[in-house]
Amino acid sequence: MDSKSWLRCINGCGVEYSVYDVKYYCEKCGGLLEVAHDLDQLRKHNGLEWRKLFESRSIPGETFHQSGVWNYKEWVLPDLDNHCLTTLGEGRTPLVQSVKLGEEMGVPDLWIKMSGTSHTGSFKDLGMTVLVSA
């Protein structure tokens, strides 16, 4: 595929679809589909370069950069034109330290994403901004 992102079957049968096709299952084997990205394209930038880019977008400016999803557009749906983005700023929910759960799990510094403080109280806001924009 020429796209930087596509859908592919998780069963490994080799079938791929455009991310813009409304498909939920592989037409060849019935397997679920996952979003795949051109990792070679993403590796053209090192971690520090990605961090600088994402942190630079934290400064008030274009609305979609204020989204906790679209701030990372290159990792979500890089081929989507910016004018197609639809956002209410979802994804900017806090991380909360969970000491007791961390102790039970053997993770001394466990942090949990509090998606319940989002617009609808649901983690589904994160996926819906991508669905509506595409």
Each language-model region and where it sits:
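PLP-dependent amino-acid enzyme catalytic core
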Residues: 1-134
